Amino acid sequence: MEVKIITDISVEPVTVAEARTYLRITTTAQDTLIGELITDARERLEKFTNLSFGAKTLKCRWDVLDGWAEIPYQPNAVVSACINDAGDTLSYDTKGLEYKYLWCVNSTGVTITYTAGFTTLPKALKVAILKEVATSYENRENFYIEGTFNELSNDAKRMAQSYSRN
């Protein structure tokens, strides 16, 4: 399965002002850096949880799809197109309320286009972004614990784990 972001979220779920307050920074001199750290933290946490933290348009492709498959980077997925490699529109069905599954019978090269994402990000995920921004701000080099590189801080992982779809 391959996922491609067509249109990313338009507004980050954490503002620079919120991050500045969390970091106890009183000036705006670091706002550009903080904004970049917010985007980076959100993207890494989205990969960790397999969720979309805001509305975005995505394409997902399966080499072979026969039966039900969970649509990645949800919640609230709305499929707008389902085609095969030849460009033929395929019959499909979805099930699920907040987290959707796609059904397609014995098809190869299936690509769906869909929109997905939280309308309001849960507080724990917002705090996870803030914790990751703080860790990245304080540790601007690679982040190591006991000689091992960590993509996310333990605090951010702990806050996001209960939402993870991985």
Range-by-range predicted roles:
Residues M1-N166:
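Divalent metal-cofactor coordination and adjacent catalytic microenvironments
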